[in-house]
Amino acid sequence: MVTTSENCVRRDTCVQNGKGEVHMKDLTDKAGLYGHGRLFTHIVVDPGCSVGYHYHHPETEFYYILKGEGLFNDNGKEVIVHEGDVCVTGFGEGHSMENQSQEPLEMIALIVME
């Protein structure tokens, strides 16, 4: 199966009460994850914008940083993340991501079910 870029659902939205809007491109729908996940999305966080702090139940979310730099809040511990880093937020844990740089932050988000 191939999903072309033209067939991806795109949306600009405030995510989890974060700052500003985040640009999202769903790489597949929930059905495409065959019951094992609910999100597989390319995300662009513009400078000054963020994904607000939130928790995951009963699921785990992965962020793979494609480009840029972000401030990742990992259960209250803030860590600067860069291209190539992977952030994991497990069941019952909380996180957020903020772009404090002058360049867009690009990442892939994948949520898998426990």
Model features per residue range: what roles?
Residues 42-46, 55-72:
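Short, conserved beta-strand element in jelly-roll/cupin
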Residues 47-49, 58, 77, 93, ...:
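A generic "binding-loop/recognition-motif" signal
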